[in-house]
C-alpha cells in the first residue's frame, strides 16, 4: 500500500554516506488532492549548463543535449502506463508551444498551455548529470568510470503555478562490494547510462502521487532510445 502525504513528505532512499552514494528525495505538497488532477503534460526537459570546472575539463563532462529528451521520454513512457492518469507527451507540447522549455516563465504561459492541452499540471525537469559508462558490463578499471545520472523534476499546477511534487535523484553506480542490493535488483553488471536512467526514473516515481501504477508483465521494457 502506498503512503499518502498528509504533510510535506520527504523520502530518502539509499546509502547517503560515501562518494558515489545513491540519493533520492521526493516531496509531495499536502494540498495536492484538492487539485483533482487526472491529466498532465510532460514538458521538454532542460539540460543544466556546464559549470566553469566542466568547461575547463576539471570536472565530469556536462550532460549531452540529448539527455533532456531521453529523460523526458522516460518519464512520459512510465507515467503513461498508470491507471487514472492521462499524459501528454513532450513532442505534442513542442508542437503546441514551440518556444516552451522546462522552466516556465510565467503563470499566464502556464494557464495558456493548460487551456490548449486541457491539462491541470505539467511535469518539468532538469538533467544535471548524464555520464556514460567507460568500460564493459563485467568490469571497469576505475570506480569513476561507472555510469552516473542526476536530475530534478517538478509537478506544477497550471492554475496557480504552485509546485505540487518534486523529485531529485543522483547515482553513480557502485561496485558489487559497496552495493549488493543494487546488483541483486538490476543484475550483476555495470549499467549503461540509459539503463541507469531507466532504473532511476522508476525509483523516483515510486512516490509519485497521481494515478495507480500498473504491474508490468515480465520482460516489458521502456522504448529503445
Where do the PLM segments sit?
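Bacterial N-terminal signal peptides that target proteins for export
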Residues: 1-8
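C-terminal/domain-edge helix-coil "capping" segments
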Residues: 19-41, 47-50, 113-117, 132, ...
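N-terminal segment of the mature soluble domain
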Residues: 38-39, 43-128, 156-158, 162-166, ...
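Outer-membrane beta-barrel domain signature
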Residues: 100, 140-142
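Extracytoplasmic/secreted cell-surface and envelope-processing proteins
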Residues: 132-138
Amino acid at each position: 500500500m502506498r503512503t499518502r502525504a498528509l504533510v510535506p513528505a520527504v523520502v530518502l532512499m539509499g546509502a547517503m554516506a560515501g562518494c558515489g552514494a545513491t540519493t533520492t528525495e521526493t516531496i509531495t505538497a499536502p494540498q495536492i488532492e484538492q487539485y483533482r488532477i487526472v491529466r498532465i503534460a510532460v514538458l521538454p526537459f532542460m539540460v543544466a549548463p556546464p559549470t566553469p570546472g566542466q568547461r575547463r575539463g576539471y570536472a565530469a563532462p556536462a550532460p549531452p543535449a540529448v539527455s533532456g529528451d531521453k529523460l523526458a521520454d522516460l518519464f512520459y513512457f512510465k507515467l503513461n502506463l498508470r491507471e487514472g492518469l492521462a499524459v501528454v507527451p513532450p513532442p505534442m507540447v513542442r508542437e503546441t508551444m514551440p518556444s516552451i522549455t522546462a522552466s516556465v516563465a510565467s503563470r499566464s504561459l502556464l494557464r495558456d498551455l493548460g487551456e490548449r492541452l486541457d491539462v491541470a499540471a505539467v511535469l518539468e525537469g532538469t538533467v544535471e548529470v548524464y555520464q556514460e559508462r567507460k568500460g564493459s558490463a563485467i568490469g571497469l578499471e576505475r570506480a569513476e568510470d561507472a555510469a552516473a545520472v542526476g536530475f530534478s523534476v517538478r509537478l506544477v499546477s497550471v492554475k496557480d503555478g504552485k509546485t505540487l511534487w518534486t523529485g531529485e535523484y543522483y547515482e553513480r553506480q557502485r561496485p558489487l562490494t559497496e552495493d549488493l542490493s543494487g546488483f541483486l535488483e538490476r543484475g550483476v553488471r555495470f549499467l549503461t547510462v540509459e539503463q541507469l536512467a531507466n532504473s532511476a526514473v522508476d525509483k523516483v516515481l515510486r512516490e509519485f502521487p497521481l494515478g495507480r501504477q500498473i504491474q508490468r508483465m515480465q520482460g516489458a521494457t521502456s522504448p529503445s532510445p
